[in-house]
C-alpha cells in the first residue's frame, strides 16, 4: 500500500468452526482443486476418530464423504464472491486442541488433545509466544469470543474471555477490537456429534445451521458499519468431519 495512504483495515475477524476439511465442504466447488466424494447426511451420524494416529490410517480405513452446495449455499456464495483457499490444510494432522493453539500461537507442543482437553485447565501451562501478546506489545486490542485454548498458554491464562454470543452484539454496535477470535457455541460449531455424547439436540453437527450462525456474525459486522474496514477469515480447526 502506498505510504501516503492510511490502511483502510482496522479490524481482523477470525471465525473458527469445527471439523471439516476442504474436500468435505468445497470438493465440488467449480474450478477448485477438490475431490468429489459420496454425499454426506446432514448432520453426519457421528464424529469420526481424527486423532493424529487415526490420520495416519484413515485413507485406508474409512469412506470419505462430503457436503454439496445445497447443504451450505451461503458458504459457496462467499467462495464465489470473495476468496477460497483450495490448497489450505490443517496445521497439525490431528484434533482440535493442537490446531486451536496454532491459531493463536503459530505453534503447538502437542499433536493430540491433552487428557480430558485439560478442562478445567491446570498446570503446567504452555510457555509459548502468542499472537495476542504480540498485539498487546504493539498497543493493539484483541478479544477471545468463546475460545478455550487461550487458557492453555501461560501469558494468556486468566485474560478476559467473552461468550460467543457477545461477538454479534459488539459487532452490531460497531465496537470491535483490532483482532477478534470468534468461536461458535457447540450447536452451531458444525462439529459432528461425539459418539459418546448423550445430547438429543438435533442441531448438533448440522452444517446448514452452523453456516447460518456464521452468516449472522458477518451480517452483524455489516450492521455495525464495520464492513469497509474489516477483513474476515472463516476457517475450520481440523479435518475430523
Tell what function each PLM region has:
Residues 1-241:
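N-terminal pro-sequences and low-complexity stem/linker regions of secreted or lumenal proteins
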Amino acid at each position: 500500500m502506498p505510504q501516503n495512504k492510511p490502511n483502510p483495515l482496522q479490524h481482523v475477524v477470525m471465525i473458527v468452526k469445527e471439523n471439516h476439511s476442504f474436500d468435505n465442504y468445497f470438493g465440488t466447488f467449480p474450478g477448485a482443486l477438490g475431490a468429489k466424494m459420496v454425499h454426506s447426511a446432514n448432520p453426519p451420524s457421528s464424529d469420526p476418530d481424527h486423532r493424529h494416529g487415526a490420520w495416519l490410517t484413515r485413507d485406508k480405513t474409512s469412506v470419505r464423504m462430503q457436503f454439496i452446495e445445497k447443504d451450505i449455499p451461503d458458504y459457496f456464495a462467499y467462495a464465489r464472491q470473495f476468496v477460497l483457499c483450495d490448497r489450505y490444510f490443517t496445521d497439525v494432522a490431528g484434533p482440535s486442541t493442537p490446531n486451536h493453539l496454532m491459531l493463536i500461537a503459530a505453534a503447538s507442543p502437542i499433536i493430540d488433545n491433552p487428557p480430558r482437553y485439560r478442562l478445567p485447565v491446570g498446570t503446567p501451562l504452555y510457555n509459548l509466544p502468542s499472537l495476542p501478546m504480540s498485539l498487546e506489545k504493539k498497543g493493539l486490542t484483541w478479544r477471545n469470543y468463546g475460545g478455550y485454548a487461550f487458557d492453555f498458554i501461560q501469558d494468556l491464562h486468566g485474560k478476559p474471555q467473552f461468550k460467543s454470543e457477545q461477538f454479534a452484539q459488539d459487532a452490531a454496535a460497531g465496537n470491535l477490537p483490532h483482532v477478534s477470535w470468534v468461536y461458535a457455541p457447540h450447536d452451531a460449531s458444525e462439529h459432528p456429534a461425539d459418539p459418546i455424547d448423550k445430547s438429543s439436540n438435533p442441531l448438533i453437527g448440522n452444517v446448514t445451521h452452523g453456516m447460518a450462525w456464521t452468516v449472522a456474525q458477518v451480517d452483524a459486522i455489516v450492521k455495525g458499519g464495520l464492513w469497509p474496514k474489516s477483513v474476515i477469515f472463516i476457517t475450520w480447526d481440523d479435518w475430523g468431519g
